[in-house]
Amino acid sequence: MLSNPKPAKVMVTGASGLLGSWVCRELLDQGTEVIAVGQRTPLHEALATYRVRLDLCDREMLDSLFQQFQPSAVIHMAALADPTLCEEQPLLSRRLNIEVSRQIAQRCQSTGIPMAFTSTDLVFDGDRGNYLESDSVSPINRYGEHKAEAEQAIHNACPHAVIFRMPFMFGEGLYHPSPMRQWLDHLSQDKPLFGFSDELRSSVDYQTAAAGIVKLHTALRGEILHLGGIETLSRLMLMRSIASAFGYNPQKIEAKVQADMTFRAARPRDVSLDSRKARAMGYKTPFLADIMHRLVKGTDFSDI
């Protein structure tokens, strides 16, 4: 069901993250006031109207945050997103990924404002790929388990909330170096680098994902949407495509398979997402070659 036009003041948690900072920029570019919330490093003043350092686990401070700023919508992206850390610190993962999400959802419900939440493709087991929004979740690591639990907690507390399941993302960071930049630094210094040929994702860049979140976060109520890219490719293929686009020899990136390594957190084989539902609603996903061109040339897709 369609709702009202985009709100004038949006609270963004996890605002200093790689995706969060792009979401803040997209909101500002469309004239929206941004309340950027982070626990450690405040977002640069050019990317937010208001900047707040806050421990989201502090319920009293969370109440004060809503009372003081009275947001017209919330995009909740703060999370403990490292699967290994989630395995090593399960209580912290549960607190940050589930309980904080539940608390924010309850406040959005009580104040009657739209909420959007970024989940992950890792809620699926990766046995077949090309997952639809209606497919049952079946996570195989703790991060995926806790994000799946967070989805349900949010739905129970705030039934109108929109849940975005995000793929593996890449691109330049607005606030701090991204994994892609680290890969390129390794290549420039002839340091060893490898990618898995049997780990498949429907990857997309941060800017494209952020534009989709901003476009759709108040357009629907109570929906789950997949915001994957058009193409499914292995991590190795993605890394080699990036290397080639930036003028490096892609063969310098060694091919490995998951069986070559031992991981604390299980890694699914193919968690590619079917994102046709979001694209039908206006989510614009360029082909990988076009994304690479923009990353190298510094152009964008705002007019597509």
Please give the residue ranges for each predicted region.
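NAD(P)H-binding glycine-rich loop region in Rossmannoid oxidoreductase-like domains
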Residues: 53-96
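NAD(P)-dependent short-chain dehydrogenase/reductase
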Residues: 152-201
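N-terminal Rossmann NAD(P)H-binding glycine-rich loop of SDR-like oxidoreductase domains
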Residues: 8-30
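NAD(P)-cofactor binding segment of oxidoreductase domains
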Residues: 88-116
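Catalytic helix-loop patch of NAD(P)-dependent Rossmann-fold dehydrogenases
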Residues: 95, 99-103, 123-164, 170
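Conserved C-terminal active-site "lid" loop/helix of NAD(P)H-dependent oxidoreductases
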Residues: 234-240, 257-304
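Mid/C-terminal beta-alpha module of Rossmann-like enzyme folds, strongest
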Residues: 210-213, 219-264, 303-304
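Glycine/proline-rich active-site loop of Rossmann-fold NAD(P)-dependent oxidoreductases
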Residues: 148, 170-181, 189-191, 207, ...
